């Protein structure tokens, strides 16, 4: 992965990087976008092979008892559409954009945030400051509950904003469970290769008020169940 945030470290590792790239017989990347957006790889494209990340499909296949659990999850939120996030609570995941987007959302839905991380306390404080009853933190989930939450959700929120998010395995997991996603445009990242704008979900440009434009995209998908179905069944 390219060094994005700690850019000052790059000068220390750059000689090693050049040496390794020169010596390599094959360089594996997870998407064409990452290949084309990585400056060190531009002169060695003939060495590059694209091998996407994969998921364990068996973990996300519906099992006996899942339908009842999915209904239980929906009932927890009074049957309102669920906008679901699952991932580590770190800076590049862009979770403040999701939490701040809530103030602009006009649809009657809930935002359910799964996972934990170094920013969890700060994110909970931000949500508390919003004083909104529709933002819920559920922490780490078991494999069974994660699967059921993905099927229960109407929309999968994936608000990452930097190339540190190189692919988006969680996107693939959500899409396997027929849950369309809303992502940001991330230049040089495979995120927009996994979630295809207007085909499997909605891609939001990082221009203007990011919180507001993200909210508008979430609203559009939450309100349009026909569009949800169209995106979820795309091949």
Language model regions located:
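Acidic donor-binding loop of glycosyltransferase active sites
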Residues: 25, 151-166, 179
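Short alpha-helical donor nucleotide-sugar binding micro-motif in glycosyltransferases
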Residues: 21, 140-141, 148-153
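Conserved donor-binding/catalytic core segment of Leloir-type glycosyltransferases
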Residues: 72, 76-93, 99-103
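Nucleotide-sugar donor phosphate/pyrophosphate-binding loop at the beta->alpha transition
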Residues: 2-19, 65
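Nucleotide-activated donor-binding/catalytic signature segment of Leloir-type glycosyltransferases, i.e.
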Residues: 80, 121-144, 203
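A short, active-site helix/loop in glycosyltransferases that binds the activated sugar's phosphate group
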Residues: 18, 22-59
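Short hydrophobic beta-strand element within catalytic cores of glycosyltransferases
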Residues: 176-187
């Amino acid at each position: 992965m390219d060094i994005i945030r700690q850019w000052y470290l790059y000068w220390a590792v750059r000689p090693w990087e050049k040496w390794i790239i020169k010596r390599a017989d094959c360089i594996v990347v997870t998407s064409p976008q990452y290949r084309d957006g990585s400056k060190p790889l531009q002169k060695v494209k003939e060495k590059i092979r694209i091998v996407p990340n994969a998921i364990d499909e068996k973990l996300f296949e519906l099992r006996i008892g899942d339908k009842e659990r999915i209904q239980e999850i929906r009932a927890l939120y009074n049957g309102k559409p669920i906008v679901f996030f699952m991932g580590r609570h770190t800076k590049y995941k862009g979770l403040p954009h999701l939490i701040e987007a809530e103030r602009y959302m006009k649809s009657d839905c809930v935002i359910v945030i799964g996972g934990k991380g170094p920013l969890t306390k700060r994110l909970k404080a931000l949500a508390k400051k919003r004083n909104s009853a529709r933002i819920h933190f559920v922490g780490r989930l078991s494999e069974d509950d994660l699967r059921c939450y993905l099927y229960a959700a109407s929309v999968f929120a994936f608000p990452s904003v930097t190339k540190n998010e190189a692919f988006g395995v969680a996107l693939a997991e959500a899409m396997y469970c027929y849950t369309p996603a809303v992502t940001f445009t991330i230049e040089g990242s495979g995120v927009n290769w996994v979630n295809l704008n207007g085909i499997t979900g909605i891609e939001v440009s990082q221009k203007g008020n990011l919180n507001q434009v993200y909210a508008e995209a979430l609203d559009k998908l939450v309100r349009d169940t026909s569009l949800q179905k169209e995106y979820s069944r795309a091949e």
